[in-house]
UniProtKB/Swiss-Prot annotation:
This protein's record includes keyword Nucleotide-binding: yes
Protein's cellular compartments: Cytoplasm
Protein name: Phosphoglycerate kinase
Predominant location category: cytoplasm
Organism: Nocardia farcinica (strain IFM 10152)
Keyword Hydrolase: no
Length: 410
């Protein structure tokens, strides 16, 4: 990645300068507004801490959830500000708006080493606008908060696949740098696409084939093993002519799955047994059945023990592993064994020297929810969608804009 990094900025000197940081602080909250998984906040700390210690006036912009372009208290970054302050060991101011009077007045009052978190950037409809001029106006307002001699650090890998004001347009207006997290993420993903050590195994789960089709098409010709579990496996099983009962099924994708199974018969591995339930609930009646014996009215919610053993045998022999998507409904204890078993096999592969990557999103959440050791994987990505789009070979706007060395008008 031919871009300037945070270290380049620190070498240039940031004491007394305003630095705008786009972090990914989009963490899950419970019904009481409490953070249930602070993983992304924790991942943002190294960049912020380095800037604080170097004496920068740090202004952080980020989003939470999907507000509809206007302020919504349930999507406020207030709990995030409190967690940031705890992890940084210093006060973090929270602006009452995105780029309004409060944000501007607080930014003008910053002293060296201070941190200001702007309110949820998606409270401003211009952030996600398709109109470049509208996004540009918000970007210009963000720049005003750090001044013309300021800098922009892109450290939110989970959003680099979005062409949004705080991710893309602002980088055109300021000297720009990849933060510690973004630089590390891209370096890791490059290892999954360039001169990858074999055997190379990919594990894909999740609910919909349509969500993973592009990455299957991109990776199937390049890998030795492609394990498919989760809700999406039932569309593949249906493509083999099997009855899947009331399991999740994308009928419009059956022919596509047939084609994939024909082309990559030696690469794609499907479950041979599944755990089925009579309803979608934590206390449903459940049983393990062969994949070709799913009863009518029952739905598959996890892969079975035989499948876990088969997949584990493949994964523990791999030298490179990429995992994206759970094997079942791991949030329900009855249907967590498949995800746990596959994850433990990947940890075992890591222990044998394999390079293993968890592709963000639900997979990263599963690692934490199931109490698995995070250091049992070579890397846990903070960006599920961005990881997939990178592996699909798509351009990531928030990365490509960093490769332009000079801001507009300089």
């Amino acid at each position: 990645m031919a871009v300037k990094t945070l270290q380049d900025l620190l070498n240039e000197g940031v004491e007394g300068r305003g630095v705008l940081v786009r972090s990914d602080l989009n963490v899950p909250l419970d019904d009481n507004g409490q953070i249930t998984d602070p993983g992304r906040i924790i991942a943002s700390i190294p960049t912020l801490k380095a800037l604080v210690e170097a004496g920068a006036k740090v202004v952080v912009t980020a989003h939470l959830g999907r507000p509809k372009g206007e302020p919504d208290p349930k999507f406020s970054l207030a709990p995030v500000a409190a967690k940031l302050a705890e992890l940084l060991g210093r006060n973090v101011q929270l602006a009452g708006d995105v780029v309004g009077y409060d944000a501007l007045s607080r930014s003008e009052g910053l002293t060296d080493g201070d941190v200001l978190l702007l309110e949820n950037v998606r409270f401003d409809p211009r952030e996600t606008s398709k109109d470049e001029a509208e996004r540009g106006k918000l970007a210009a307002a963000l720049v005003e908060l750090v001044g013309e001699d300021g800098a922009f650090v892109s450290d939110g890998f989970g959003v680099v696949h979005r062409k949004q004001a705080s991710v893309y347009d602002v980088a055109k207006l300021l000297p720009h740098y990849a933060g510690t997290l973004v630089a590390a993420e891209v370096d890791v993903l490059a290892k999954l696409t360039d001169n990858t050590e074999r055997p190379y195994a990919v594990v894909l789960g999740g609910s919909k084939v349509s969500d993973k089709l592009a990455v299957i098409e991109a990776l199937a010709p390049k890998v030795d093993t492609l394990v498919i579990g989760g809700g999406m496996c039932f569309t593949f099983l249906a493509a083999q002519g099997l009855s899947v009962g009331s399991s999740l099924l994308q009928e419009e994708m059956i022919d596509t799955c047939k084609g994939l199974l024909e082309r990559y018969a030696d690469v794609i591995h499907l479950p041979r047994d599944v755990v089925v339930a009579d309803s979608f609930s934590a206390d449903a009646e459940s049983k393990c059945v062969p994949a070709n014996e799913i009863p009518d009215g029952w739905m598959g919610l996890d892969i079975g023990a035989e499948s876990v053993d088969r997949f584990a045998a493949l994964l523990t022999e791999a030298k490179t592993v990429f995992w994206n998507g759970p094997m079942g409904v791991f949030e329900f204890e009855k249907f967590a064994a498949g995800t746990r078993g596959v994850a433990e096999a990947i940890v075992a592969a890591t222990g044998k020297g394999a390079f293993t990557v968890v592709g963000g999103g639900d997979s990263a959440a599963a690692v934490r929810a199931l109490g698995l050791p995070e250091d049992g994987f070579s890397h846990i990505s903070t960006g599920g969608g961005a990881s997939l789009e990178y592996l699909e070979g798509k351009e990531l706007p928030g990365i490509s804009v960093l490769e332009d060395t000079a801001p507009e008008g300089s």
